[in-house]
Structure formats: structure tokens, C-alpha cells
């Protein structure tokens, strides 16, 4: 796994009237503070990125559909500099959260049928939004 990228298994609780999907607790590994949270949708076959956050740690969860994340490390001095990492998140296969450290490039691709939805949480608010 790339330095600065971690994947954390999450709880998916099946209940008769609608399932519960955990996302992030302040006691979870990968949580470094709260700045903002928002949802983003992506259509099947669409790609978004490349984007790099220099100060934010991102925690990403896909509760609907499937999204492939491609991460690139160009951080000078990093043991994984020059490497790519691909990780697909989906509630259907091993529901988990992706944590991405500051300074890494990231793009993502909609792999689920129809529209996929992802939850972004970060430790700092994006001042542009």
C-alpha cells in the first residue's frame, strides 16, 4: 500500500427496514479532525480529477454504487514517490473507508451502474467552497 494511503473496514449492519452503514467516528484510525463533510455523485463511466490537497487529510466512503480511486505519489522523499495505487470502494464488496494523506494526487471513476455517491470528510474546510 502507498505511504499515506490506508483502507479501514467499516460496519454494515443489516436491519429489516433499511441497513446502517458506518462512516467515521472520532475514535477511528485515520480520523485527524473535522473541517467539512460533503457528498459527491459520479455517473457510470465518468472520471473526476486530478486533484491534490496539500493540507487536508481526506476520508472517503462510498455508500451507494462503486467508485475506483487512483492515487499518485509525487512527494519528494516519499518511499512510494512515482507510484500509483488503485482502490475500488463499494458497499457491495468489503465496505470500507479510504484515508488519503495530504500531498497525494487523486482521481476517481464511476464504476457502479447509474449514479454512485461518495462521502468526503476532511480535517480542514475548503475555503473555496
Listing of model-derived features with the role each one plays in the protein:
Residues 76-78, 83-94:
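The conserved catalytic core of RNA pseudouridine synthases
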Residues 90-111:
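Conserved metal-binding segment of the jelly-roll/cupin
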Residues 1-4, 47, 85-89:
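A short Gly-Trp-Pro
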Residues 120-125:
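Conserved small/polar residues in nucleotide/adenosyl-binding loops
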Residues 1-33:
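A short, N-terminal "cap"/entry segment at the start of jelly-roll beta-barrel domains
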Residues 57, 62-68, 73-74:
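Glycine- and acidic-residue-biased ligand/ion/polar-headgroup-sensing regions
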Amino acid at each position: 500500500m502507498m505511504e499515506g494511503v490506508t483502507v479501514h473496514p467499516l460496519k454494515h449492519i443489516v436491519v429489516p427496514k433499511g441497513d446502517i452503514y458506518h462512516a467515521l467516528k472520532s475514535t477511528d484510525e485515520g480520523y485527524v479532525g473535522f473541517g467539512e463533510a460533503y457528498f459527491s455523485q459520479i455517473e457510470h463511466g465518468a472520471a473526476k480529477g486530478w486533484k491534490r490537497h496539500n493540507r487536508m487529510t481526506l476520508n472517503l466512503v462510498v455508500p451507494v454504487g462503486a467508485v475506483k480511486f487512483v492515487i499518485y505519489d509525487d512527494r519528494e522523499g516519499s518511499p512510494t514517490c512515482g507510484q500509483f495505487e488503485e482502490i475500488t470502494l463499494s458497499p457491495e464488496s468489503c465496505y470500507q473507508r479510504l484515508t488519503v494523506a495530504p500531498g497525494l494526487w487523486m482521481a476517481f471513476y464511476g464504476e457502479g451502474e447509474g449514479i454512485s455517491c461518495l462521502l468526503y470528510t476532511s480535517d480542514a474546510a475548503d475555503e473555496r467552497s
